[in-house]
Amino acid sequence: MDVDPVNSEMELDNKPTCETVPGLPQKKHYRQRAHSNPHSDHDIEYPLTPDHMDWSKQYGDYAAGRQVEFADIGCGYGGLLMRLSPMFPETLMIGMEIRVKVSDYVNEKIQALRKHHEGAGHYRNIAVLRSNAMKYMPNYFRKGQLSKMFFLFPDPHFKNKKHKWRIITPTLVSEYAYVLREQGLIYTITDVKDLHDWMVKHLNEHPLFERLSDDEMKADPVVAMLYESTEEGQKVTRNDGEKWPAVFRRLPNPPL
């Protein structure tokens, strides 16, 4: 799949936020390893069920009458959330990040952006949670709640014995199918061809997902955001690396 992200409109959308915002955290103070052991999460607090989750802690009164619909899994420094927020201002989006310092950075950046745009109410629809999506996804989201899920430049876990730690596995794909509504979309991108093939294989093999065609991907404005919105994506570009995107649609459940 080769979707060209380089045209004037997409370049504008993909540029990192450059506005001067008082109180923005400095990323150099929040540096952490690029990836984290998904089993090192013993101090994470999570809701017993989605009914126990109080989203007002993340969104304030903006959560009233709304439910989270977009989930960026392993959101890193939150670049995708910042890009999608003005595109879908009425949609609640959550970034899930297991690394403590990184999730703290994203939260402080969101708070600073909200304060700076307080009169206009921008960025109230995005938030971050420190959580392990590999373990606790059904604790946060109800069946069919999400309309979009994002897996951007996930940890490739190169060693064969660690493939079970990859964020796309047969078991996890079934969980994603549970929380994703019919016609919902899973977006993936990586600079590791082996990981791309792995993710495509397991999503293709699941009976509740089908891959979008090239034309469907080109028609989706969100696809352009996958390439450059994240720090990892920008790093791949600087190193002249190749990026492999794929998008999958959640199919209706088969009749009983």
From Swiss-Prot:
Molecular-function GO term, any one: tRNA binding
SUPFAM superfamilies: S-adenosyl-L-methionine-dependent methyltransferases
Pathway(s) served: tRNA modification; N(7)-methylguanine-tRNA biosynthesis
Cell compartments where the protein resides: Nucleus
InterPro entries (UniProt xref): SAM-dependent_MTases_sf, Trm8_euk, tRNA_(Gua-N-7)_MeTrfase_Trmb
Alphabetized UniProt keyword annotations: Methyltransferase, Nucleus, RNA-binding, S-adenosyl-L-methionine, Transferase, tRNA processing, tRNA-binding
A single Gene Ontology CC term: tRNA methyltransferase complex
EC number(s) reported in the record: 2.1.1.33
Reactions that this protein is recorded to catalyse: guanosine(46) in tRNA + S-adenosyl-L-methionine = N(7)-methylguanosine(46) in tRNA + S-adenosyl-L-homocysteine
Main location: nucleus
Region of interest (Disordered), residue spans: 1-43
First-tier enzyme category under EC: transferase
Compositionally biased spans, kind Basic residues: 26-36
Record-linked PROSITE patterns: SAM_MT_TRMB
GO BP annotations listed: RNA (guanine-N7)-methylation; tRNA methylation
Catalytic residues, chain numbering: D155
Residues the entry annotates as binding S-adenosyl-L-methionine: G74, E97, I98, N132, A133, L152, T230, E231, E232
Family listed: Belongs to the class I-like SAM-binding methyltransferase superfamily. TrmB family.
HAMAP family from the UniProt entry: tRNA_methyltr_TrmB_euk
Function field: Catalyzes the formation of N(7)-methylguanine at position 46 (m7G46) in tRNA.
UniProt protein name: tRNA (guanine-N(7)-)-methyltransferase
Taxonomic placement: Eukaryota, Metazoa, Ecdysozoa, Nematoda, Chromadorea
